Amino acid sequence: MRLSSSPPRGPQQLSSFGSVDWLSQSSCSGPTHTPRPADFSLGSLPGPGQTSGAREPPQAVSIKEAAGSSNLPAPERTMAGLSKEPNTLRAPRVRTAFTMEQVRTLEGVFQHHQYLSPLERKRLAREMQLSEVQIKTWFQNRRMKHKRQMQDPQLHSPFSGSLHAPPAFYSTSSGLANGLQLLCPWAPLSGPQALMLPPGSFWGLCQVAQEALASAGASCCGQPLASHPPTPGRPSLGPALSTGPRGLCAMPQTGDAF
């Protein structure tokens, strides 16, 4: 068996008619199948929930984020919501410290005019080297203070004295002395020791009454009456109930009548 040797063919020369050459090449290579739009099946198309890749639609992502945030405890959700809000805290106001000279000047103006006009406020602020807002605020506070002082007169003189008079501990002795003065006008009055008695000194009052009665009896009868100090456990009835030399100045002694 002999092998036929054929010389290699050179490049085929193309004719001037390109369409004829294209047809000849297509007939030699065989028919090629080109896909048509109808060849695509409905199953190969991605559905509404399927995408080409691992990405998910934004609606599904937002639903998952909402579900995840709902699982958080209430304090964390509150802090998460507050962290997104802007910081609306105001800076604290700075109080103006007036000097004594400024306060004296403002008080002098307030005594004449409690309300300032805009021109007067501007002039006063320029003279005192303050702002109009500071002048206006000071006058507002001063008017409120003046109103409180007018409503409560005690604010004018807080240390003028006590509001209530102290109780009189010498009412009994003074009434007794007045009665003795009416009975015996020439009897001397008792000294001021009754005014110096401390509160609650019952025996001191009795002693003063005894001395007053003794002095009155001596002036009436010519000799002093016997006065006995109170004994513990037995109240003293005073010298008015003791015996005396005359019936005009002494009362009968009390005893067991029955």
Swiss-Prot record:
Residues 91-150 bind DNA. One of its GO terms (cellular component) is nucleoplasm. It is found in: Nucleus. Transmembrane segments: none annotated. Expressed in bone marrow of patients recovering from chemotherapy. Also expressed in an erythroleukemia cell line. Keywords: Developmental protein, DNA-binding, Homeobox, Nucleus. PROSITE patterns: HOMEOBOX_1 (PS00027), HOMEOBOX_2 (PS50071). Residues 1-93, 227-248 are annotated as: Disordered. GO terms for molecular function: DNA-binding transcription activator activity, RNA polymerase II-specific; DNA-binding transcription factor activity, RNA polymerase II-specific; RNA polymerase II cis-regulatory region sequence-specific DNA binding; sequence-specific DNA binding; sequence-specific double-stranded DNA binding. Residues 1-32 have a biased composition (Polar residues). Its main location: nucleus. CDD domains: homeodomain. May be involved in ventralization. This is Homeobox protein VENTX. It comes from Homo sapiens (Human). The lineage of its organism: Eukaryota, Metazoa, Chordata, Craniata, Vertebrata.
